[in-house]
Amino acid sequence: MRMLWRSLALCGLALTLAPCAQAAEPIEGKTVYIDAGHGGEDSGAVGNGLFEKDINLAVSEHVTDKLKEEGANPVASRSDDHFLTLEERVAKASANQADLFVSIHVNSGVASASGTETYFQSDYEGENSRRLASDIQSQLVSSLQTRDRGVKESDFYVITYSQMPSVLAELGFITNSSDADKLGSEEYQQKAADAIVNGIDSYYDQ
């Protein structure tokens, strides 16, 4: 009888531990499309000696690396300085059957404008897109300590026509000297990338 109880106890322990041992990270295996805005002859916003296209690409590369570390399958719209149409960006995400679409940008405006904002569009996967935008925005503001300009709805092409939850993050204002100093820093770019991935993690953890 003692042996029987010991066997039952061991079986119970094994059943308790098995789900933990086998549990995968929620993001593991997900295909996440990372879109570095602009590129090539399209420099995007320009300010304080910086080009938006370069910042977008640098952050995108850090995001891609971090996603790989977490077992996701990141797909980048571009890995170098070349031009892609908006239609090509959306088509590539669809061709790769992406689970999420995250477009990375920096903003421009009057010199006093600063801060971070994240956009979604509600026509397709609206609630999931809003939730993803909220999670990424929250992580960006917390990590970067930027002014929180909020989560907003807009009809940017890439988030309107992508057939999966889609967001567009504006990391800061290239035309604001304080924001620009940070945006041009590799350390800050890495922090922004980590925050974006943490936002994606939060989205899948819910």
From Swiss-Prot:
Matching CDD domains: MurNAc-LAA
Single GO biological process annotation from the record: peptidoglycan catabolic process
Gene designation: yqiI
Entry protein name: Uncharacterized protein YqiI
GO molecular function, one term: N-acetylmuramoyl-L-alanine amidase activity
Pfam families documented for this protein: Amidase_3 (PF01520)
Phylogenetic classification of the source organism: Bacteria, Bacillati, Bacillota, Bacilli, Bacillales
Cysteine pairs bridged by disulfides in the record: none
Domain MurNAc-LAA: residue ranges: 32-201
Record carries keyword tRNA-binding: no
Cited InterPro entries: MurNAc-LAA_cat, N-acetylmuramoyl_amidase_3
Family of the protein in this entry: Belongs to the N-acetylmuramoyl-L-alanine amidase 3 family.
Keywords (A to Z) from UniProt: Hydrolase
